[in-house]
Amino acid sequence: MKNKRVLAKITALVVLLGVFFVLPSNISQLYADYEVVHDTFEVNFDGWCNLGVDTYLTAVENEGNNGTRGMMVINRSSASDGAYSEKGFYLDGGVEYKYSVFVKHNGTGTETFKLSVSYLDSETEEENKEVIATKDVVAGEWTEISAKYKAPKTAVNITLSITTDSTVDFIFDDVTITRKGMAEANTVYAANAVLKDMYANYFRVGSVLNSGTVNNSSIKALILREFNSITCENEMKPDATLVQSGSTNTNIRVSLNRAASILNFCAQNNIAVRGHTLVWHSQTPQWFFKDNFQDNGNWVSQSVMDQRLESYIKNMFAEIQRQYPSLNLYAYDVVNEAVSDDANRTRYYGGAREPGYGNGRSPWVQIYGDNKFIEKAFTYARKYAPANCKLYYNDYNEYWDHKRDCIASICANLYNKGLLDGVGMQSHINADMNGFSGIQNYKAALQKYINIGCDVQITELDISTENGKFSLQQQADKYKAVFQAAVDINRTSSKGKVTAVCVWGPNDANTWLGSQNAPLLFNANNQPKPAYNAVASIIPQSEWGDGNNPAGGGGGGKPEEPDANGYYYHDTFEGSVGQWTARGPAEVLLSGRTAYKGSESLLVRNRTAAWNGAQRALNPRTFVPGNTYCFSVVASFIEGASSTTFCMKLQYVDGSGTQRYDTIDMKTVGPNQWVHLYNPQYRIPSDATDMYVYVETADDTINFYIDEAIGAVAGTVIEGPAPQPTQPPVLLGDVNGDGTINSTDLTMLKRSVLRAITLTDDAKARADVDKNGSINSTDVLLLSRYLLRVIDKFPVAENPSSSFKYESAVQYRPAPDSYLNPCPQAGRIVKETYTGINGTKSLNVYLPYGYDPNKKYNIFYLMHGGGENENTIFSNDVKLQNILDHAIMNGELEPLIVVTPTFNGGNCTAQNFYQEFRQNVIPFVESKYSTYAESTTPQGIAASRMHRGFGGFSMGGLTTWYVMVNCLDYVAYFMPLSGDYWYGNSPQDKANSIAEAINRSGLSKREYFVFAATGSDHIAYANMNPQIEAMKALPHFDYTSDFSKGNFYFLVAPGATHWWGYVRHYIYDALPYFFHE
């Protein structure tokens, strides 16, 4: 890369000297021969712009002079179109410079190039332009054009341009401007230190440049010394960047020409830039909102404005990246001044300005009807902004109470959705410590915004003396109070930080308020004022840092840090609902009727559906998708049901834009009891955006309460309410419930049978000693025999034999085509996260339509194939959920739970997944969902094995065989699909290994069932069929699909290959045969 040699180096030397002492007046010149400008274009556009509205500049790699990077000029409409660059900062009138540039074109023949200088005469205020060199250039050859030229002494804003006599495309490179003799030193009088270093460990200190001040060498030297953030005063506003010609609804043209010299200065000198601004009711041309991009057109529709807004924001960020990729664009005011000063409008209209154009009215409100455009703008900005660019809402009078509260409400909503990083406080105030913009109101507003959790930047600070009404010392006191407030926030806040304090102008001669109001830190001669010295007195020297590398980059956007308990948030609902809001038409409010801790909890009422609950947005900077966290809340209800199931879930939008709902925890509880919803190891899906944690009930609309809501570091131990004592097991025969079985119980039973007394429900359960569902003389006889010790236990009536209509030779039968469409009685998929022997992993749980946690369900675990994951089976490609929904709705399949785990992750493989299945998956799933497992102890799981199945496709079929061999004590039904058992060297070895596992289990042939399937043209058929034949020969299997008579079947689909489009139908054919024995 070529070395950039610019005047900034000499300026930096002078500035460095200025840090330590005031340059004596007799030292006014440095003797040197030097390059004033050397533009190489190796990284940035170096301040060069298109000359001509349709002309396009682009950097071309390896096509510049000497095979480096150069600048190509294309799409010229006239000979006057070309390229230009403002060089006013580097060049002075009355001084002779040598100008040089290398050019090349690939046209035909010879092209005449022109090198021109234009300038503004500071006395006559006339624009002048002179061609200083012409040269005929042969096609395909790099040629130098050079000339010496001295502009008049009154010349300012000197600009260099390159054109030709035609509209041919051309390339230019290596622009140099040199001078002989003596370089004028920039004398900048300084205090004893510089602001950017003093505050480097707290925040950036910024200032403003515009098209005039950027050409003032004294101001730029001051900027280089004192500040590490720059905002373009007007040059990046919409009227400066929007290009009317050639714009379409989906491609808004933008230009950085007016900002180019400022952006180039910042890029060359590593000064960070605040972008200002994208969306504003003011200084945005009217045509941008009108049909055909004409001022007199009709207002466009919202949908069209959405397109224009997105394109404008997208193209602005893209153009900055294209022209100045090295620029540190650390912050951007996405929306500016959208909230009205009118208290009536902040109270009743969400702060929206009056609709219209001009005089403070908003064309954005004219089109959208309210302030909904704000969220749209931030959504687009978040989509297209560089990752390190923080997004801000910026406004004035931001300390006025009604406006402050409206701004805070808007920004909290945006922040909670992960769209906004901070609030910009413009801070145009006066030197009065009291009154409307007094320091107490100002600090209250600053704290209000910090309490959102976001960062704050003081973006346009100036403190007016109001033409001498306030003294310079009063101004100094106010400046110190503002800076001190920002420092105090950063020293104490556990939430947001102040990441920049930017003054709105370099000196009192360059301020929008007029020099008579003297609102800035330096006077008109760049001398530090008392305000500067006051600000410089706050930070002790021991805390100074490197202003060129401020702490955290000064850009903000850090995630919240957990407190000493590991909590990111802890909502106690004592006096505040915090950031919790209602879902749907529900209402959330504080209540003192009941509380788990303290005196208040959050009441959720006026619910019309089960999903109407309470929610809290999660900040993605803190709760990072893909990472694991702890979530906890306690919940209770008082009346309206005998029991309810509380669910704590995550609502989010996935990578495809689909809204998803994932269960964090769910538990059932009775009235007047608190239940702990708690998952210390919940992994947020990696593609999650727009996240909310919420609490609802499973299937009722009762009022309920929550308390002690916590989001914390993964693994945090949070104690909840003690588990409610469980009912003791029913002691059959103990009719009166006194814990013993004696003649008193027999007497009560007889009197009940004779209808002399009526038993309670609990007594009936104990009196029904044969458990056949009725109380009769058989129970009397059995209890009598038990008391006489004829029997030592009560015989339990056998379950009736299955009424399922088996077929003895099932054939491949695809599900009806309609089953691939969504079902009106759709179940739901819940993504769960658990931590086991192979780390933190996810699985999906299918719950049938009308899932009732008070009922018991059979459960089927279904494994994916190689190269797939837990999401494959329930994806839109496989559509298995639709098939299950239809089959259940039409009575072809009993409602059941289906779980799709994964053998990916950690040290897990398809062969050893059974270990994780036993130790982690079954206990995790069946402790959360209602299956036949009375407990998730090994004994409880084993006791419910006849209600549990396992299957898998391809490599998942391999997993199924390994589960069978190693988990027969836990699983009774197996569905290996298109996968054989990888064991031994022959089909007989495989069959014998399976037989040995059965022998070890001690199970009878009526206690395990295998329904295998594949396609005749599937590659797995060649390996599966010999294994199946060897198994059929074993005495352990009776081959038939009628599981009332046998326990083994192999379904072969004619012509079917390796495709889920077939496999889903295998499941449809086989699954109805499970769980009837």
Curated annotation (Swiss-Prot):
Transmembrane segments: none annotated. InterPro entries: AB_hydrolase_fold, CenC_carb-bd, Dockerin_1_rpt, Dockerin_dom, Dockerin_dom_sf, EF_Hand_1_Ca_BS, Esterase-like, Galactose-bd-like_sf. Its EC number is 3.2.1.8. PROSITE patterns: CLOS_CELLULOSOME_RPT, DOCKERIN, EF_HAND_1, GH10_1, GH10_2. The keyword Signal applies. Residues 189-538 form the GH10 domain. Residues 543-563 are annotated as: Disordered. The keyword Repeat applies. Keywords: Carbohydrate metabolism, Glycosidase, Hydrolase, Polysaccharide degradation, Repeat, Signal, Xylan degradation. This is Endo-1,4-beta-xylanase Y. It comes from Acetivibrio thermocellus. The gene is xynY.
